């Protein structure tokens, strides 16, 4: 390979591996050893004492019931964000978790952050915590931090105080420079302190959780020793158990190793009948879900995680994936995932991070078949479902789901069949999205691609053959750009707020069914102001998603704006559609996109 053919990044160059392969490598395997510095790393069994469990039972277990969930989005998830949640975003996330059915929610680290402290006070004083929901707060074992944690929670009905300290070989050596006895004493002193502080607030039902942080890097015998010492101090009972949380703070080995450690701990911990054994897997090796499922099979009772796997580095285990994995095997997750798009939109708003298009169950592409053979199998599977339902005198939604390539009925999580089998039926000829971008400069959002593909499909179904780029543009313009009934925007004037975060006002001239009138409104930006103005003439519009981009460079460049909106008709029926606007002004383009959505919803 010549230097010009190499991929470079900084001082590194990607070159084909060429070092000799192991002598026992089969002849049919032509791979060679690379020049990467493998010598700098070592097997897990050389870093932490190996686990011996020849009579393990977890491989034969079947998951047939749901664990106790604890959502840690507001603490572990929030601390990993580039832009940590504002109070409003935290409240929106908390309310979502409550609506979905989570009964244990870690709401912050109040002793480490004034923002977290204030949020805990807010949800307590506002009465936002339902009686059957227990909040959880995290604290290190330092006395002053524990004291402030309890002050933050004063007045709450039920609270889990989650205290922790790191116990791993590496952290004992390089962070604390302390021996095992010192580290254990930190844990037991913390346990005594939480009991002492709890006595000052007798009106709250206090529960306790202890984590030997970096558990996966800790000798099992020592992890048990520390956990048993904490248990002895807390003195739990079967009626009021202690939560012992065994986190894969850093995922260090294959999931079966984690499962072995959980089964060993479950067998050997003191007073197991008074212990709730909890898991907290991270995803450093990409196997967080597998580790959680195998660890649960191995004897755990409870799992902590985040929606869509947000969290430090590669994230916490994904509660959506875990819950819907149970659902697809006939186990009720005891959580409502029936509107996966609303859940995703809320999580994306709160985290200010996108959910990957291939993320299990929630990504834009997970119910999409691009392959013709896959589409054919899905079509035949759906047809077979209809036949079976008719034979049984039932609806498809009432019979066992069996469709190739789709482990779940998209409708059960609020998706549609059209998005599955229609989205890219012409992709062999270039694809709707590719043509719209390469020929017309429009970078359509994924869900708009799905919606517009259906319009293209109607043309191909009716006329047959291939749709040319010009024909595709004509369909797009007719669908999104040219309709002016019932609503047409003529002009607008925007008065921007004088300070950041202020309120903009808009005055616009519009035609409603051809009759010109002037409207005005206010909001956080021109788009929100225009939506507010439309409400004064009977148009109920809620913007769900918005994006924009320039179509070219230069001072006179046009911009494209895309709005996904819920538009409620005069009869009270809400329709979710996309609207598109193109103009030299991005403000005008965005308002045209709203008008486009209204006209499409009400046509």
Please provide the spans of the model-predicted regions.
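A mid-to-C-terminal "edge-of-domain" accessory segment
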Residues: 17-75, 330-520, 555-558
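Alpha/beta enzyme core
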Residues: 39-41, 69, 85-103, 120, ...
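Short, small-residue-enriched loops and turns at beta-alpha junctions
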Residues: 76, 80, 110-114, 168-170, ...
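Short beta-alpha connecting loops at secondary-structure transitions
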Residues: 132, 171-172, 246-248, 276, ...
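Conserved structured catalytic cores and adjacent interaction surfaces
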Residues: 559, 584, 595-602
